Amino acid sequence: RAAFGELDPISPSYRNRDARLADLDAQGVEACFMFPTLGVGMESALENDRPAMLAAFRAFNRWVDDDWGLNHQNRIFSAAYLTLADVDWALEELEWALAHDCRVINMRASSVLGADGQRRSLGHPDHEPFWAALNEAGITLAIHSGDAGYGFMVDYWGQNAEFEAFRHEPLKMLLTYSPISDAVASLIAEGV
């Protein structure tokens, strides 16, 4: 409440796709993308436990499809959330998403931790099979803000690195402002 004041009650359209369609109609909006809120912290929280991370991503995507549909009536396009921490897994999950008429995928704005313990940019050559498949599919890539793993920058400057959604400390914000532009830069610079 300190950050936002009194909040409006949760609208049924936040949790029900038919109510969301009614809101879209009332607002004159043809269609929308839907992105995860709390889901954007999964990769950072679980990157050192690859089986748990991949299971969490898979479960999240199945839940989104069950609850909202990855493509509901060509009007609500829910993003499947993928990671390149395991390219073979990402290709399997992309294939599943495409089979469920997915039109947009979401990725974390960060490098990924490979099975060998080394970090790789999104544009790293090891990820080329995924980018080729995504390009062939012709669907949209979204890079969503969230816990990008930039806590090391905050630690370096003596700040509390714990990620807290909706809490904004000026120095912390300035030290971690660039994950999305960094991710896009890696894709451009490495030829994706």
Regions found by a protein language model. Give the residues of each.
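Helix-coil boundary/capping segments in enzymes
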Residues: 1-192
